Amino acid sequence: MKQLADRRRRDGQALVEFALVFPVLILLLLGILDFGRAIYAYNTIADAARDGARVAAVNQIATSPAGDCTQTRPIEDPSNAHWSVKTCAATSATALGIQTGAVTVSYTAPPGTTLTCTPVNVGCIANVTVDYVFNPITPIIGNIVGTIGMSSTSKVPVERVFP
């Protein structure tokens, strides 16, 4: 009889220990999941900024219906350059739902030069910035840190300009 009572006591103890440890383990697991999602989001916006900067560097415009960066042609109308770069970068980050409004494009002169970059000239630096707001899916982590603003900028020299 004493063995049965000891066994029940041990079973109850294990249940209490499990009840105390389980929420911590779940929180840790969800934190790891959110951390992985944050790394994925940052890598995606970094790739999008790079893709947009490459299109800006060669002064090309996307020709595929989806607006991605794989098929390009020279820009006949330079006023389309910003549109093409923004569309390319936003399309590269489709998985995050990034729109063209989250992409900023600017052209600056290299330091120590008198090069004018309005309109764009060869040698100007194309700056493409992609912004994203990351929302953790774990409620307790979301309450502690809130939303996390992410931004990635890619800078490349303009290699060619078409008339």
Where are the language model's segments positioned?
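A generic structural micro-feature
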Residues: V120-A126, I144-I148
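Alpha-helical assembly-interface signal, strongest on the long, hydrophobic N-terminal helix that forms
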Residues: K2-A89, A93
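Short amphipathic beta-strand and strand-loop transition segments with alternating hydrophobic
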Residues: G101-N121
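A short hydrophobic beta-strand element
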Residues: C124-F134
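Outer-membrane beta-barrel architecture
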Residues: T104, I125-N127, S151
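Short secondary-structure junctions
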Residues: T91-A102
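Low-complexity, S/T/G/P-rich flexible repeat/linker segments used as non-globular hinges
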Residues: T63, P136-P163
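Alpha-helical transmembrane segments of polytopic integral membrane proteins
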Residues: Y42, F134-I137
